[in-house]
């Protein structure tokens, strides 16, 4: 996400401050997990990892993510960059992918049919690794 949102930034601390404790409850974590559309067999690992994140770290991570923007010099990048975005992702994520693609001259963008955010690398890990190996082997 490369579209900063000051409003989102300002809402993260009060929202997570008031409901952070809920992540320790499995019923709540299952609701979160379901919304992420991750394979069900990964829930135990997700729950363990989520419970290990300190409140201050979670807030800091989410706040920084909400105000991230591309640096002015990004256009000077000489790397060939692959950009994957799910067809079913939020518009802000699709727009961010397009912005990155437009700023990077040698970038390639692919919209992945019927996929949500993170689904390619998590739920289709074999395909994701195969794609990475193709990229590495082309060098």
Q: Language-model segments: which ranges?
A:
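Catalytic histidine-centered segment of alpha/beta-hydrolase-like enzymes
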Residues: 112-129
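Short beta-strand/loop motif that positions the catalytic acidic residue
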Residues: 76-77, 83-85
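C-terminal alpha-helix
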Residues: 127, 131-139
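Flexible "cap/lid" loop of the alpha/beta hydrolase fold
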Residues: 1-22
């Amino acid at each position: 996400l490369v579209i900063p949102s000051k409003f989102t930034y300002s809402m993260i601390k009060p929202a997570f401050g008031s409901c952070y404790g809920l992540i320790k409850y499995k019923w709540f974590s299952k609701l979160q997990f379901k919304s992420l559309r991750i394979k069900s067999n990964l829930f135990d690992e997700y729950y363990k990892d989520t419970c290990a994140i300190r409140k201050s770290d979670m807030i800091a991570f989410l706040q920084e993510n909400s105000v991230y923007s591309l640096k002015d010099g990004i256009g000077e990048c000489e790397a060939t960059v692959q950009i994957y975005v799910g067809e079913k992702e939020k518009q802000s994520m699709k727009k961010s992918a397009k912005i990155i693609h437009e700023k990077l001259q040698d970038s390639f963008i692919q919209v992945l049919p019927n996929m949500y955010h993170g689904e390619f690398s998590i739920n289709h890990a074999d395909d994701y690794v195969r794609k990475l190996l193709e990229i590495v082997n082309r060098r």
